[in-house]
Amino acid sequence: ADDDNNTGADHKRTLHWNAVGTEVLSPATLTRFGVEYNIVDGLQHSPYRNVYAGGSIVPERHPDHRERRDAFLKLSQYFENRSSLRFNYRLYQDDWGILSHEAGTRLSQYVAPGLFASYDYRYYTQTAAYFQSDAYTSVGGIDGYLTGDYRMAALASHLFGFSLDMDLGVMAADVPALRRLGVRIDFERYFNSNNYSANILETGLDFRF
């Protein structure tokens, strides 16, 4: 570590509570819901991250206490055409001033024997922590706190995804070499309000013994 961000030993302690319920609304409809509550005490910033403040480079400082709360709802609906639609929503709030909403959906569709396709969308938005700033005017920050963590800033993001699952043992049952193989292809397009975007491609090969 640099001389300006050396810190002594510290700790972090988290107390976690949650309650989750599942309800079958019909033979084709399932819902899941829950709440979570976390109390975090101790070191909650990075001792290796610095911030430009008041013309100087200083270590970031976060509050030592944080209370985090969230609630979620998930709904799954299955259809007779061998497809399913899933919806999820999560609300989050903490005493650092961050309030976030996350909503997403997934459509899964049977295409042909051994072939399944999925389409995904997720939207996320959050407010900034009360002590976050793009330009601190003094080394004291805001109420004594400073952050260089991008996760403390306001944000809105979108994610689109598409995936294919192929069971080659079903699709090419007459080819002995493929009977134990499966292939998965995932593509995601992500972009946010902080001028960051990414294209993510993942592939996987499954071999069944």
Predicted ranges, named:
Residues G54-G55, L107-Y110, V139-I142, L205-F209:
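Short, surface-exposed linear patches
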Residues A19-E23, L73-Q77, Y89, T105-Q109, ...:
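Residues on the lipid-exposed face of transmembrane beta-strands in outer-membrane beta-barrel proteins
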Residues V24-L30, E80, A112, G169:
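Residue-level recognition of beta-strand termini and adjacent short loop/turns
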Residues Y78-L85:
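Gram-negative outer-membrane beta-barrel transporters
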Residues A1-Y52, S56-D64:
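Solenoidal tandem-repeat scaffolds enriched in leucines and small polar residues
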Residues A1-A9, L15-W17, T105, Q109-Q132:
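Long amphipathic alpha-helical scaffold regions
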Residues E36-S76, Q93-E102, G114-N195, N199:
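Outer membrane beta-barrel transmembrane domains
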